[in-house]
Amino acid sequence: EVGASTGAEPANAQSRGPQYGAGPNVDRCNCPLIQREDQFQGVNSWTKIFGNHSIKFGADLRYARNLRVPSDNDRTGILYFSNQPTSNGSTGGLGFATFALGEVTGFRRYVSTSTNAKEFQKRDFFYGQDTWRVTSKLTVNYGLRYEFYFPETINAKGNGALLDPATGYLNVAGVGGVASNMNWGRNNNTYSPRIGVAYQIYPTTVIRGGYGRSFDIGVFGSIFGHAATQNLPVLSNQEITATGGYLSSAFTLAQGPPAPTPIPVPSNGLLPNPGYAVNSRARPNPLRLPTLDAWNVSVQQSLTPTLSLTIAYVGNKGTHTLGDGSANTTNPNETAVFLPAQYSITGQE
């Protein structure tokens, strides 16, 4: 990317010089992207009617698989040319001139040790419900659903890792005492009750009300995919910037970028998080599921044989639904908390 604004990377200001490139800021392309996700599923339900009861129960068994090899930062590398090396100290300069001199001010690329790191997850659901016609005017529907979301597993030793926020270590799957599920636990409190009531007060008036709870897997990466195989030691997001002042460069085009530094995995499978220089992906342990509680009450009045009026109150409450944000902030617009090394369990910032 060639740009005119200050800093190691151009911010694409159009005030000075040409702006062009193939990186995240100009015409972003996650290329090449290898993505294959599928799911095997078996579902069945049974119904039994006796008296004024209609009972249903069933099961939904799923097995999900995912392979994702991303290139958000191109695997051949993204070169950045800012105006600084051709500036007069902190003013002036031209990104295109920096490019002509071959002075690279920033560099990013994705480096993978495996292009076959896959994730698997079992999801099992069971339910039972009863529609009970109590009287000719009163009907009650009640039921319970239970959902099993197992922690995802990785297909091979060292093909995935998750950052444990409680320890500061990346749990590397299949290494040492770390299991293929990275020693993650599942949420056992996944009961989903449902109840609904309909009562006919008068021949032309009916009151209805209900409540239900449901769970979800969230956005891609919340509890499955797009996390474990996007961490070290599988994926390294290499980033190099100029550190020698306004007129310095990270390297020249003639030199080329340095090779990424290999990250050895300790024999116990606990890889210390490399610090703020690496954006490691984490999940709560045990898994935390997005939850929705919903309720409603309504009154339906028949006005004529062909016209009715319904007044309703509908409410819902979502819990743990935030898809992307720093867990360390009270305000989503604040920056993340910086933890000094002396207070870190790993001794790192």
Language-model features: locations:
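Short acidic-glycine motifs
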Residues: 1-349
